Amino acid sequence: MMYYCGIDEAGFGAGAAQVYVSACVLDPQKPINESLTDSKQLTPKKRELLAEEIKQDALTWCIATASVEEIEKLNIRKATILAMKRSLEGLTVKPDMVYIDGINSPEVPFPVETVVKGDSKIPAISAASILAKVARDNRMLEYDEQYPEYGFKDHKGYLTKNHIKAIQKYGPSPIHRKTYKPIKKIIDNQKNQQLELF
């Protein structure tokens, strides 16, 4: 029997917090309910329910992260690839084939194929997409309690108008990606304003 692993990330384009990556090998004997699709197409409630079902019925799965520090040091693409490797290392069954959403792939001892928009084409990627998004969204709710002034529960760290306004007003928090261009621009502007005061 062939085991296919799907990998997807959550938080690649965000301006705050870790990037999450999930690897998931579905059990051919236990097909997950037909509503598996790109996690962004599902309601939060539906995602939560499916995530529980996937965790229960998948052959093996692992959610890994790359920290803000790693993102700052390596860049977001390399940090995501690092988290992909970590997610694969956490699997208890070796996959025969790994399908990764998008165009980035790590060097791993398995055959790998990248699939653009794979989260809406390949069930194992859809499952990984749901696990990664649910895990990251839940973490962002915790960050919202820690840093309520930024509204993380609403935008999950992505740079909406309100999020940018909050960073301009309060400065970046410890979980903001300070090398991310829009945030770096805010920091540089604030430094220049301070210099003008002297």
Swiss-Prot record:
Keywords (A to Z) from UniProt: Cytoplasm, Endonuclease, Hydrolase, Manganese, Metal-binding, Nuclease
GO MF, one annotated term: manganese ion binding
Domain RNase H type-2: 2-192
Chain sites annotated for binding a divalent metal cation: D8, E9, D101
One annotated GO biological process: mismatch repair
Domain of life: Bacteria
Record-linked Pfam families: RNase_HII
Family according to the record: Belongs to the RNase HII family.
Protein name per the record: Ribonuclease HII
Gene that specifies this protein: rnhB
